[in-house]
């Protein structure tokens, strides 16, 4: 089987043509190590045994996210291990990291990443900001194992701890930066989402009740009001539908200089606020 045959199989299974080609390229390059020239000229079986290829094709035909099939996802120009126990890193979240880096490079801040998942935010900030002291929390043991795999393979200096964002410890004045991409998709938004996200990615990392969309943000903002140093900064990835409520909540919580930033698609995706 060759590249053109494989992407056509996926296209016939229901993928759009562009998506079928992109998924095929990611599988062949990131899992099988094929170059563009290899894809044009070589049989895939030269780089993978027939059984593995058959299993991978079957998984993709069932719309398993290609990142889970490959076991890797790109984030800020690095390959991170991903498995179904963590969310697949999104390009939008890269912009959140870049905002922190813009503000704090090269000042060696103390950083906490709440809800670290794969560890992509924590590892990126630890590697990109010299001298940064980075802690990371998650409540999922499976996510913590994945994050630690990434931290070790990338040689990032990050301390990962099991901690519930809704019941945090009583830290005071410990961090210069707290960053989080918590669950923020309302249950009612499920019907507009891709089926493979709903079927394969962990729902506890995605969804919040319709009647309490700011559940995690309020808890984290309260914790940050105690644990940030004076002038420290809180950064969130947010649901664009809730940006006004987020600004109001942070203002009411005593934060200053509350700023919204759009993502690459023009949606109000990020917010930062400064502890007075």
Indicate residue ranges for each PLM-predicted region.
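N-terminal auxiliary segments of SAM/dcSAM-dependent transferases
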Residues: 1-70
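S-adenosylmethionine
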Residues: 132-133, 137-275
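SAM-dependent Rossmann-like transferase core, predominantly class I methyltransferases
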Residues: 55-129, 134-147, 272
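Short, glycine- and charge-enriched coil/turn segments that flank and shape catalytic ligand pockets
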Residues: 47-51, 103-110, 131, 168-172, ...
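Residue-level signal for pocket-adjacent positions within structured domains
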Residues: 34, 64-65, 70, 75, ...
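An acidic site on a long C-lobe helix of protein kinase domains
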Residues: 49, 89-92, 216
């Amino acid at each position: 089987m060759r590249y053109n045959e494989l992407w056509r199989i996926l296209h016939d299974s229901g993928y759009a043509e562009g998506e079928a080609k992109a998924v095929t390229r990611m599988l062949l390059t990131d899992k099988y190590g094929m170059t563009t020239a290899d894809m044009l000229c070589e049989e895939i079986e030269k780089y993978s045994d027939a059984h593995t290829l058959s299993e991978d094709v079957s998984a993709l035909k069932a719309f398993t996210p290609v990142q889970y099939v490959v076991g890797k996802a790109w984030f800020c120009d690095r390959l991170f291990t991903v498995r179904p126990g963590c969310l697949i890193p999104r390009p939008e979240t890269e912009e959140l990291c870049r905002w922190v880096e813009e503000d704090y490079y090269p000042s060696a801040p103390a950083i906490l990443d709440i809800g670290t998942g794969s560890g992509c935010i924590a590892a990126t900030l630890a590697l990109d900001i010299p001298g940064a002291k980075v802690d990371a929390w998650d409540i999922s043991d499976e996510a913590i194992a994945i994050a630690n795999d990434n931290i070790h393979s990338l040689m990032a200096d990050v301390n990962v701890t099991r901690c519930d964002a809704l019941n945090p410890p009583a830290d005071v004045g410990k961090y210069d930066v707290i960053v989080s991409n918590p669950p923020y998709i309302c249950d009612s938004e499920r019907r507009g989402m891709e089926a493979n996200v709903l079927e394969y990615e962990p729902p506890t990392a995605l969804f919040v009740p319709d009647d309490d969309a700011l559940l995690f943000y309020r808890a984290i903002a309260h914790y940050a009001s105690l644990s940030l140093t004076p002038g420290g900064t809180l950064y969130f990835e947010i649901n664009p539908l809730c940006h006004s409520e987020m600004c109001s909540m942070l203002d009411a919580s005593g934060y200053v200089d509350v700023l919204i930033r759009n993502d690459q698609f023009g949606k109000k995706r990020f917010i930062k606020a400064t502890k007075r």
